[in-house]
Amino acid sequence: VFCYDNAGVPTLETLVWTNDTTRATALAYQNGVLIKSGDATRRYLGSFYASGANTTEDSAANRYLYNYYHRIRKGFSVIDATNSWTFTGATPVRQANASAANQCNIMNGVAESWVEATVATVSENSGGSVTIGVGVGINSTTVNSAQIFGNITDSTTRGAHTAHYRGIPAAGRIQIVWLEETANSGTDTYYGDNGTTRMQCGLVGSCYV
């Protein structure tokens, strides 16, 4: 979104990106101010991601509005209310519960603000002395980008573990994914809420919008 002087009237102008992560026209600096590259009359104000036809969204799951000026920090979160689920197979890392819903999405207009995300889960494995864990994926359902993360190496005993990501992602729509990892031995059981009100696993974080 850009603003320009239209015969004395401040006027907004939008420019659709090429894709989720690539601008159709780059930004540039003019006297320390971000502008549309090649047109110093257009001052950059922010970006938004279209969640549907002629609509966008600002919710706990999707922070799709980004202001370059006067940004505030807002939280995002996703939980899985499934009591529990199992994970076996040759794919060592996947999105939690194999569900595309287990992620949060943000719009990052300029790569200069910190994003933080934490996954907290409880799990167990039916085998003996195998390692299972969790992570945070940034635009990936198979690569863990968390800088701090834990695992458990035990059998038939539930363990709690977390993963934490803190970084400045690239500009564009950013998918922040709740990941889980299997040891490919035995059967992993991950828990959502275990059918109680005393447990809830999920992903939480915050970003500037």
Where are these regions (language model features)?
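Extended extracellular/luminal ectodomain segments enriched in beta-structured repeat modules
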Residues: 108-116, 171
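Short beta-strands within extracellular/lumenal beta-sheet-rich domains
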Residues: 93-108, 158-163
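Terminal beta-strand-rich extracellular "head" domains
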Residues: 118-171, 178-209
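A short linear-motif detector with a strong N-terminal bias
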Residues: 25-27, 94-97, 154-156, 177
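Residues within well-ordered beta-strands of beta-sheet-rich folds
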Residues: 2-4, 114-118, 175-179
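Substrate-binding/charge-relay-adjacent region of secreted/lumenal peptidase catalytic domains
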Residues: 79-88, 94-99, 136-140, 147
